[in-house]
Swiss-Prot record:
Transmembrane segments: none annotated. Belongs to the universal ribosomal protein uL23 family. Binds to 23S rRNA. The keyword Cytoplasm does not apply. Part of the 50S ribosomal subunit. It comes from Oenothera elata subsp. hookeri. Keywords: Chloroplast, Plastid, Ribonucleoprotein, Ribosomal protein, RNA-binding, rRNA-binding. Gene3D superfamilies: 3.30.70.330. Pfam families: Ribosomal_L23. The gene is rpl23-A. InterPro entries: Nucleotide-bd_a/b_plait_sf, Ribosomal_uL23-like, Ribosomal_uL23/eL15/eS24_sf, Ribosomal_uL23_CS. This is Large ribosomal subunit protein uL23cz/uL23cy. PROSITE patterns: RIBOSOMAL_L23 (PS00050). The keyword rRNA-binding applies. GO terms for biological process: translation.
Amino acid sequence: MDGIKYAVFTDKGVRLLGKNQYTSNVESGSTRTEIKHWVELFFGVKVQAMNSHRLPGKGRRMGPIMGHTMHYRRMIITLQPGYSIPPLRKKRT
């Protein structure tokens, strides 16, 4: 259950919600089958297709040393018609 980090709500992510596609960042070591099984089990939905791509880490400098943050993977999950995932938002207090 540690595979999915958080949902992504960019312009493209919001546009894809109309096509029943959900975008989220996942652990870079997770496989498609692990994420598909976890989404179907946790949310009770049927996954039709999954697309993924790896995003590069950003460069970070600490004095003369140049480093970088960890890279991560972004998954676009397409659900079968009739299924949906409730919004994943934190409540504001």
